Amino acid sequence: MEAAFWHQKWADNQIGFHQAQANPYLQRYWPGLGLAAGSRVLVPLCGKSLDMAWLAGQGYRVRGIELSRRAVEDFFQEQGLQAQVWQQGAFEVWCSGEVELWCGDFFALRAEDVADCVGLYDRAALIALPPQMRERYMGLLSQILPVGSGLLVTLDYEQKLLAGPPFSVADEEVRRGFAGWQVEEVEARDVIGESPKFLQAGVKRLVERVYRVQF
């Protein structure tokens, strides 16, 4: 999957993955992580997610990583924020208050870029990637993150019925990819009744899983 795919999605405003409000799982389970206010939270492949505004509103410092400059611009504009912009290595950094969005290729991240990130929030990153890229993604996070904790949300369905993204990620793949982490499933829910696109494709079961992870 090339970068051009996502640039085109944003250019065409084909962003069905964007949610119009903060994610309920985030609001329900994040407080249980026990991360101190002021902790830095990494949000990979963040888009213009309102979850980042929610985290900042709870007193956390957010570092989102996003390929699309359009998404980054939209986030700050829609939040009514003026951003300072500078170049840092392979990334263009946009910053306002407690939120930094790093515009560039996630796979260019280095350990020093996330050395202060003791929180992780992934609602739509892992499931946005095809299998080989998921393996790279999980491997990189496992390699570069310091000690910390976070939340991961996945989808699990019969992949052959529908081409991703979002892609199906089985429980076994999560546990294998993050083998060095403590991975605890805290909720699993069949949401097929809320998902017309999947119903039309003949999908019978669409399971959203929420994991608490410690790394």
Curated annotation (Swiss-Prot):
Task: Quickly give the catalysed reaction.
Answer: S-adenosyl-L-methionine + a thiopurine = S-adenosyl-L-homocysteine + a thiopurine S-methylether
The entry's S-adenosyl-L-methionine-binding residues are 10, 45, 66, 123
Keyword Transferase belongs to the record: yes
Q: Where in the cell is it found?
A: Cytoplasm
Q: Does the keyword Ribonucleoprotein apply?
A: no
Instruction: Name one matching Pfam family.
Output: TPMT
Q: Which UniProt keywords apply?
A: Cytoplasm, Methyltransferase, S-adenosyl-L-methionine, Transferase
Q: Name one GO cellular component term.
A: cytoplasm
Q: Name one GO biological process term.
A: methylation
Query: Which Gene Ontology terms cover its molecular function?
Result: thiopurine S-methyltransferase activity
Give the stretches traversing the membrane: none
Can you tell me which family this protein belongs to? Answer: Belongs to the class I-like SAM-binding methyltransferase superfamily. TPMT family.
Protein name stated in the entry: Thiopurine S-methyltransferase
Which organism encodes this protein? Pseudomonas putida (strain W619)
Gene behind the chain: tpm
